[in-house]
């Protein structure tokens, strides 16, 4: 009898991501399990009420026609799911860490980025098309919020944060703004498959929280709450997704991760643990750049990938959506382990 290889289900990938995150927190920061578990539960339960409301409000996703054909069946799935999981991720930490100034700053940045995403999602829904605010408008809004955040950072005496690279001085500004806007957009780009941004975001947030917990405990609480919120969202966003997070969710996740990294001086760690986001963003940049560089008089150019971002390249190569997500989870977990090893030297050499 011939055995047929079947792709993993959405539940299987989501449970694997949850097991990785839960085990890491239980082992290395058991006191934070309450924050993580409470946020996960609140988001999961809220989703059962929020998703039908989004469907009733006709907050429907519009699928790009030039994307994979298999995604056309997702048209009409509710979007803007960030409105029910991001608030829990940003509110719960205050119950455990109090009104810490750094926590307030990080939450304010994530909230402002989520608001930019909400404006984009709202315009898409209102116009009944896949065109929200323009990329230029979105970038200007993200930069504006980033500048305000950096002003707080500088005025509070952290403007010379090292990021593990030595004192930066005036270079703090461009590097911090690049991290804030770049991470937000990278997570946004990654959010193209069911459960992809949520699972990889949870893994990245967990390890970043473990890294900063000794020196910035309030920011660590935010990270663990964000991880719980992302996994709670997977209850509804795993394949086959009943809701998408939209820019409301993805920009807020990226903003929160970057804000924690900037405030704690851990941008190198962010780049490593968020390597999946970095590669996804670079795949788009490389695809566009190569196409323009090889464009002939007829206006046609060559492509490095079958389709960008990278997850679509693998889809068009024959992998099922859940197989791509599972592999990206594995890559995210491997990068998380590498980041933790570089940070702590664990496991010790013989």
Swiss-Prot record:
Signal peptide: none annotated. Its cofactor is Mg(2+). The keyword Cell cycle applies. Its main location: membrane. Keywords: Cell cycle, Cell division, Cell inner membrane, Cell membrane, Cell shape, Cell wall biogenesis/degradation, Magnesium, Membrane, Metal-binding, Peptidoglycan synthesis, Transferase, Transmembrane, Transmembrane helix. It is found in: Cell inner membrane. Pfam families: Glycos_transf_4 (PF00953), MraY_sig1 (PF10555). Its EC number is 2.7.8.13. It is a multi-pass membrane protein. GO terms for molecular function: metal ion binding; phospho-N-acetylmuramoyl-pentapeptide-transferase activity; phosphotransferase activity, for other substituted phosphate groups; UDP-N-acetylmuramoyl-L-alanyl-D-glutamyl-meso-2,6-diaminopimelyl-D-alanyl-D-alanine:undecaprenyl-phosphate transferase activity. Pathway: Cell wall biogenesis; peptidoglycan biosynthesis. It catalyses: UDP-N-acetyl-alpha-D-muramoyl-L-alanyl-gamma-D-glutamyl-meso-2,6-diaminopimeloyl-D-alanyl-D-alanine + di-trans,octa-cis-undecaprenyl phosphate = di-trans,octa-cis-undecaprenyl diphospho-N-acetyl-alpha-D-muramoyl-L-alanyl-D-glutamyl-meso-2,6-diaminopimeloyl-D-alanyl-D-alanine + UMP. The chain crosses the membrane at residues 11-31, 33-53, 79-99, 104-124, 139-159, 160-180, 195-214, 218-235, 242-264, 328-348. One of its GO terms (biological process) is cell wall organization. GO terms for cellular component: plasma membrane. Belongs to the glycosyltransferase 4 family. MraY subfamily. NCBIfam families: mraY (TIGR00445). Catalyzes the initial step of the lipid cycle reactions in the biosynthesis of the cell wall peptidoglycan: transfers peptidoglycan precursor phospho-MurNAc-pentapeptide from UDP-MurNAc-pentapeptide onto the lipid carrier undecaprenyl phosphate, yielding undecaprenyl-pyrophosphoryl-MurNAc-pentapeptide, known as lipid I. This is Phospho-N-acetylmuramoyl-pentapeptide-transferase.
């Amino acid at each position: 009898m011939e055995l047929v290889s079947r792709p993993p289900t959405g539940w299987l990938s989501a449970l694997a991501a949850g097991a990785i995150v839960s085990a890491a927190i239980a082992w290395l920061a058991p006191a934070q399990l309450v924050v993580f578990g409470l946020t996960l539960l609140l988001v999961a339960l809220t989703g059962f009420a929020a998703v039908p409301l989004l469907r009733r409000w006709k907050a429907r996703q519009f699928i790009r026609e030039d994307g994979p054909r298999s995604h056309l069946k997702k048209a009409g799935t509710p979007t803007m799911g960030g409105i029910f999981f991001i608030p829990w991720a940003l509110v719960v930490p205050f119950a455990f860490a109090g009104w810490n100034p750094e926590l307030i700053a990080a939450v304010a940045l994530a909230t402002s980025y989520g608001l930019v995403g909400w404006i984009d999602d709202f315009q898409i829904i209102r116009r009944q098309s896949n065109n929200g605010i323009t990329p230029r408008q979105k970038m200007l809004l993200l930069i504006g919020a980033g500048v305000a955040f950096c002003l707080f950072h500088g005025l509070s005496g952290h403007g010379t944060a090292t990021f593990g690279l030595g004192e930066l001085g005036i270079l703090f500004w461009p590097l911090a703004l690049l991290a804030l806007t770049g991470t937000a957009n990278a997570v946004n780009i990654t959010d193209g498959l069911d459960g992809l941004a949520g699972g990889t975001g949870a893994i990245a947030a967990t390890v970043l929280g473990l890294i900063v917990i000794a020196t910035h405990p309030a920011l660590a609480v935010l990270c663990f709450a964000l991880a719980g919120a992302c996994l709670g969202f997977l209850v509804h966003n795993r394949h086959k997704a009943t809701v998408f997070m939209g820019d409301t969710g993805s920009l807020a996740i990226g903003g929160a991760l970057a804000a924690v990294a900037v405030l704690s001086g851990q941008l190198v760690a962010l780049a490593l643990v968020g390597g999946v986001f970095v590669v996804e963003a670079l795949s788009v940049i490389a695809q566009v750049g190569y196409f323009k560089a090889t464009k002939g008089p007829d206006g046609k150019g060559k492509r490095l990938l079958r389709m960008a971002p990278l997850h679509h390249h693998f889809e068009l190569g024959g992998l099922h959506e859940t197989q791509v997500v599972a592999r990206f989870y594995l890559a995210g977990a491997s990068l998380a382990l590498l980041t933790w090893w570089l940070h702590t030297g664990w496991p010790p050499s013989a």
